Amino acid sequence: MRVLFVSDVYFPRVNGVSTSIRTFRQDLGTCGVETLLVVPSYVQSGAPSGGGPPPDEPGILRVPSSGVPKDPEDRRMQWGGLNRVLSTIPRGQVDVVHIQTPFIAHYAAARFARRNGVPCVATYHTFFEEYLHHYVPVLPRSIGRYLARSFTRSQCADVQALIAPSDPMRDVLLEYGVSTPIHVLPTGLPADRFNPGIAERFRSEQGIPAGRPLVTYVGRVAHEKNIEFLVKVFVEVRKTVPKAMLVIAGEGPAREPLRQLVARLGLEKDVHFAGYLDRNTGLLDCYAAANVFVFASRTETQGLVLLEAMAQGAPVVSTAELGTRSVLKAGCGALVVEEQLQPFTAAVVQVLQDAALQSDLAERGRTYARTWSSAIMARRLAELYESLRVSPGAERAIA
């Protein structure tokens, strides 16, 4: 079976969608599913790497793209270029189309599926309602909610099946009035996420003294990730643990505003911006070095980063919103707290000061993370593809 993935983002752009696509592609291959991926080119000044796919990733077609205003990380595929690339795929060579993002990729991929008479599935990675609130703040929240819900219903009607990465995200779609069948299917963790990171190497490469307890965030440095709240928590944490350092690993549009906030607070020597880290070495080392991993995003459709932290034995303190509620189960190796300054601060301080608690959370977290096998998730996705191919209008629910 051959499945066409179409996405508005992919590596070298680092985010959850890129990670999900790569993880599923790797594991689907062992299920007898060949994937072809159509994504933007990233040939631009200052890009993390060139526009072509890395040598170990065959089956990628890059589309000419242009910059996105006020967003140097992302690229916008050219409509004509995207359709020209899709037109090179011979009719009958694709069994299922899988849309990964809701922008130009969605409309071109849905059109391709209709013209070729093949079923189409989409993964709902992005919680638009909250994103609109952060990126178009002048828009009244009620209007933003109406627009997000109308837009979502319209796009979901274009496909024969939907994938929600978590139960709460499925519930949101049902509340919107989406009638397309919804299947809950998280990405899962590939086996290499459990390769042990080297904490000492991270500290050495980043110039961080061995004696400083690390309060660590990993992810996109964007306003919707609620990192400003974590900075406020850190200010309070230092009153009890003055040697603590906040590590922010990642890039994004909120990096400069956060740097300015840190400067105003006089914390330049206590907050370390690590930037992008190599996924196979630096990122694992970063997790391994964390004395406590903190997270307070309101927009996660899954919260895969929490599982990655647990896989490396990082004790987690986090809020539980949307997709992270599905990850943060009882006994999972995390302290779950409300988004309130004092309770969150108290939980972080408790972990930093209690070595036995750190060890217990680390052990339980590693054990729990292993239950989220990406290979199992890929088999379930392959079953969905097969049911769509056999009977596009009557796919069965995946187990």
Ranges and model annotations:
Residues 315-319:
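Short hydrophobic beta-strand element within catalytic cores of glycosyltransferases
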Residues 209-234, 247:
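Conserved donor-binding/catalytic core segment of Leloir-type glycosyltransferases
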Residues 256-277:
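Nucleotide-activated donor-binding/catalytic signature segment of Leloir-type glycosyltransferases, i.e.
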Residues 298:
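Aromatic "clamp/platform" in nucleotide-sugar-dependent glycosyltransferases that forms part
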Residues 330-341, 350-355:
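Conserved acidic donor-binding segment of nucleotide-sugar-dependent glycosyltransferases
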Residues 276, 284-290:
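Short alpha-helical donor nucleotide-sugar binding micro-motif in glycosyltransferases
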Residues 1-64, 90, 397-399:
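N-terminal subdomain of nucleotide-sugar transferases
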Residues 195-208, 394:
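A short helix/loop element that forms part of the nucleotide-sugar donor recognition site in Leloir-type
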